[in-house]
UniProtKB/Swiss-Prot annotation:
Biological source species: Pongo abelii (Sumatran orangutan)
Taxon lineage: Eukaryota, Metazoa, Chordata, Craniata, Vertebrata
GO MF annotation list: amyloid-beta binding; G protein-coupled receptor binding
Protein's recorded name: G-protein coupled receptor-associated sorting protein 2
Biological process, per Gene Ontology: hematopoietic stem cell homeostasis
UniProt keyword terms in alphabetical order: Phosphoprotein
Residues passing through the membrane, by range: none
Family matches, as InterPro entries: ARM-like (IPR011989), ARM-rpt_dom (IPR006911), ARM-type_fold (IPR016024), GASP1-3 (IPR043374)
Subunit structure: Interacts with cytoplasmic tails of a variety of G protein-coupled receptors such as muscarinic acetylcholine receptor M1/CHRM1 and calcitonin receptor/CALCR.
Organism superkingdom: Eukaryota
SUPFAM superfamilies the record matches: ARM repeat
GO (cellular component) term, any one: nucleus
């Protein structure tokens, strides 16, 4: 870091070529020495917790001087043997497992002497690049931050089956001499191949590299070819559900959670509360595996070491040091790291880094919190999973920060490997084709750290976890400030004030409540009022008694409503008074509604059930408020004329008077509705008028249109004798309209008996003469066709069993003879020569 002292003893070790052995790392000099400027004064020793004074650089984890190797478990003064579980007293470093004096051999669990082996990402913002055969020189970022003592060692030789050695220590051959079939991408070579560009010499370079890196460069990153070309050796953060299929039998258990919520922001700090920094470089989609690198926000090194057995079980070590940056609204960030210290219980340490003070040292959240973020694992399916730490300590796994996990499967198990992912996901992430267990959902409002795996399908969480980040409601503070005692206990205590608007009918109530009479409520419900006729014939409406309780309407109604009797008296008083001396601001006076128009309005309200028409009537009655524009429009057009226009009624006072008189004459037809009464009135007046008069012709036309439906056929059939008489006395024009009306009736079997009576048949037959118009004859023919179809369908027998067909049969025979004679007469008229010869 800037301003830190130079540690001369820190040097980076170059990577060996393929086919060579790695000799003792400390004795070799690097071609380009890497100057490390750590702030740490005390040298980390074996078995001691590192004391760090490293400044926190943005988007970087704190750095300790103790360096570890990626993908290797810590060892304590012991050689690494294949399949042996290590016991360690090593100190942990951010982003790596604790290391002791051991050197790393290719693909095996290694011992290191505080050296960073390829696969361990430096904790500073600048990652060191160890020099490789590609000519990649160790670089550091321009900021001049310190680098770790990285020694780039190849994990395995590519051109020979020899094992990379470190300090002369041997290792299990089974871990290195891997059959080439396990690695389809190694081009038939034995050993563990890193991912490099095509045609390059396959050497595993350092996994420590700086952030500014071109995509064209070879990706010598952590990851190896898995048993399947189509499977990836690590998890790619692409916003999708993570799937790692590096297990030969595709039987793996997944315990992974990430906080990314499908939001990956490469090389940038997440702005959401639960985002992770991800920069994943993937090669071509056609390749079997994709190289990956997680940058400053999240330093993740995944190491899979395949081992070939009879069942091709893989000992995979998924190593992850990640950092979740949680930003609250105060721009505070919590950094969690996975440092496991020897001989201690599990505890959680979080680095709080404030935006204003980036140099805050690492602080402990809990010194010896045994219950904080502890995960205990028991053997499942003849295998044990190391969770949350890099060593075994009396089968108790310590997790510090919850960011480290190891996936291990014993050689003889049939379950494959239980994969522990190094990132957290709120949704299920799968390693392999089959997930043994499902990730437990956790609350969105509280981040619980330290448990990625489950013991017997039960999540082991601390009862009192150390709160890292909790979502707080933005509006909760304002709501909590309200005093509960001041809140109303009942609705009676609630007072709502409404501001009067221009149009209360749009859903706003008036400024003052009012009570509306019962008769007005009947209008609202579109029910006809009970009209009581006086001896003089005038209608009297039942009025609301003062002592009777009336329903209360608290919305949309104006308090100036008056009863019908009050309105009538008011309008009569206005008519009797002089117009010059009369001054009133009521709605009836404003709309200029007279007494006669008001009575017509009452009749229309009784007859019409249209709610829109009722709204207009309510405005005129004073029951509903309206804007000034609406009132002016109703006044200029007239309320009755407006309603009649909307109903397509004739906009004339004569028609309104006719309807009013018809209603007053309703007692002769007490069981008929308004339209039926009107039809009966029209039939009587039509037959009463003089023959061929204009009034009679108008009535017949109206009845012709009313008979388009069968609703009123029975009523009109009662006047059949009168209409048949018109066929003998009226002119051709009147006959045409009468026959049109009877043609409509002929389609109804219910009136066929009256229509085709003996008298009717004789009249119809009498129309077949040379003097009758062709149109009238054609209508009569259609009528006989209709009755013939009714008889053939059997509908006539269902309606009337007593209906006799004898008159119809005789009429049909006579009709045929008349038709032939008529046709001959027509032919003679069209051909004069034939007529003269005959």
């Amino acid at each position: 870091m800037t301003g830190a002292e130079i540690e001369p003893s820190a040097q980076a070790k170059p990577e060996k070529k393929a086919g060579e052995e790695v000799v003792a790392g400390p004795e070799r000099e690097n071609d380009v020495p890497l100057v490390v400027r750590p702030k740490v004064r005390t040298q980390a020793t074996t078995g001691a917790r590192p004391k760090t004074e490293t400044k926190s650089v943005p988007a970087a984890r704190p750095k300790t001087e103790a360096q570890a190797m990626s993908g290797a478990r810590p060892k304590t003064e012991a050689q690494v043997m294949g399949g042996a579980r290590p016991k360690t007293e090593a100190q942990g470093m951010a982003g790596a497992r604790p290391k002791t004096d051991a050197r790393a051999v290719g693909g095996a669990r290694s011992k290191t002497d505080a050296k960073a082996i390829p696969g361990a990402r430096p904790e500073d913002e600048a990652q060191a690049w160890a020099q490789s055969e590609f000519g990649t020189e160790a670089v550091s970022q321009a900021e001049g931050v310190s680098q770790t003592n990285a020694v780039a060692w190849p994990l395995a030789t590519a051109e020979s089956g020899s094992v990379t050695k470190s300090k002369g220590l041997s290792m299990d051959r089974e871990l290195v001499n891997v059959d080439a079939e396990t690695f389809p991408g190694t081009q038939g070579q034995k050993g563990i191949q890193p991912w490099f560009g095509p045609g390059e010499e396959t050497n595993m370079g350092s996994w420590c590299y700086s952030r500014p890196r071109a995509r064209e460069e070879a990706s010598n990153e952590s990851g190896f070819w898995s048993a399947d070309e189509t499977s990836t050796a690590s998890s790619f953060w692409a916003g999708e559900e993570t799937s790692v299929r590096s297990w030969p039998r595709e039987e793996s258990n997944t315990r992974s959670r990430h906080r990314a919520k499908h939001q990956t922001n490469p090389r940038s700090r997440p702005r959401s509360k639960q985002e992770a920094y991800v920069d994943s470089w993937s090669g071509s989609e056609d390749e079997a595996g994709n190289p990956f690198s997680f940058w400053a926000g999240e330093n993740t090194n995944n190491l899979f070491r395949p081992r070939v057995r009879e069942e091709a079980n893989i000992r995979s070590k998924l190593r992850t040091n990640r950092e979740d940056c949680f930003e609250s609204e105060s721009e505070d960030e919590f950094y969690k790291q996975s440092w496991v210290l020897p001989g201690e219980e599990a505890d959680s340490r979080f680095r709080h880094r404030d935006k204003e003070d980036p140099n805050t040292a690492l602080k402990l959240r809990a010194q010896k919190d045994v219950d904080s973020d502890r995960v205990k694992q028991e053997p499942r399916f003849e295998e044990e999973v190391i969770i949350g730490s890099w060593f075994w300590a009396e089968k108790e796994t310590s997790l510090e920060g919850g960011a480290s996990a190891i996936c291990e499967s014993e050689p003889g198990t049939e379950e494959g490997a239980i994969g522990g992912s190094a990132y957290w996901a709120e949704e299920k992430s799968s390693l392999g084709a089959v997930a043994r267990e499902e990730a437990k959902p956790e609350s969105e409002e509280e981040a619980i750290f330290g448990s990625w795996f489950w013991d017997r399908d039960e999540a082991c969480f601390d009862l009192n976890p150390c709160p890292v980040y909790k979502v707080s409601d933005r509006f909760r503070d304002a709501a909590e400030e309200l005093n509960a005692s001041s809140r109303p206990q009942t609705w009676d205590e609630v007072t709502v004030e409404f501001k009067p608007g221009l149009f209360h009918g749009v859903g706003f109530r008036s400024t003052s409540p009012f009570r509306i009479p019962e008769e007005a409520s009947e209008m609202l419900e579109a029910k006809p009022k009970n009209l009581e006729l006086s001896p003089e014939g005038e209608e009297q409406e039942s009025l609301l008694q003062p002592d009777q309780p009336s329903p209360e309407f608290t919305f949309q109604y104006d308090p100036s409503y008056r009863s019908v009797r009050e309105i009538r008296e008011h309008l009569r008083a206005r008519e009797s008074a002089e117009s010059e001396s009369w001054s009133c601001s009521c709605i009836q006076c404003e709309l200029k509604i007279g007494s006669e128009e008001f009575e017509e309005l009452l009749l229309l309200m009784d007859k019409i059930r249209d709610p829109f028409i009722h709204e207009i009537s309510k405005i005129a009655m004073g029951m509903r408020s309206a804007s000034q524009f609406t009132r002016d429009f109703i006044r200029d057009s007239g309320v009755v004329s407006l309603i009649e226009t909307l109903l397509n009624y004739p906009s004339s006072r004569v028609r309104t008077s006719f309807l009013e008189n018809m209603i007053h004459m309703a007692p002769p037809y007490p069981n008929l509705n308004m339209i039926e009464t009107f039809i009966c009135q029209v039939c009587e007046e039509t037959l009463a008028h003089s023959v061929d008069s204009l009034e009679q012709l108008t009535g017949i036309r109206m009845l012709r249109h009313l008979t388009m439906t069968i609703d009123y056929h029975t009523l009109i059939a009662n006047y059949m004798s009168g209409f048949l008489s018109l066929l003998t006395t009226a002119n051709a024009r009147t006959k045409f309209h009468v026959l049109k009306m009877l043609l409509n009736l002929s389609e109804n079997p219910a009136v066929a008996k009256k229509l085709f009576s003996a008298k009717a048949l004789s009249i119809f037959v009498g129309l077949f003469n040379i003097e009758e118009t062709n149109d009238n004859i054609q209508i009569v023919i259609k009528m006989f066709q209709n009755i013939s179809n009714i008889i053939k369908s059997g509908k006539m027998s269902l309606i009337d069993d007593d209906f006799s067909l004898e008159p119809l049969i005789s009429a049909f025979r006579e009709f045929e003879e008349l038709a032939k004679q008529l046709q001959a007469q027509i032919d003679n008229q069209n051909d004069p020569e034939v007529g003269q010869q005959s």
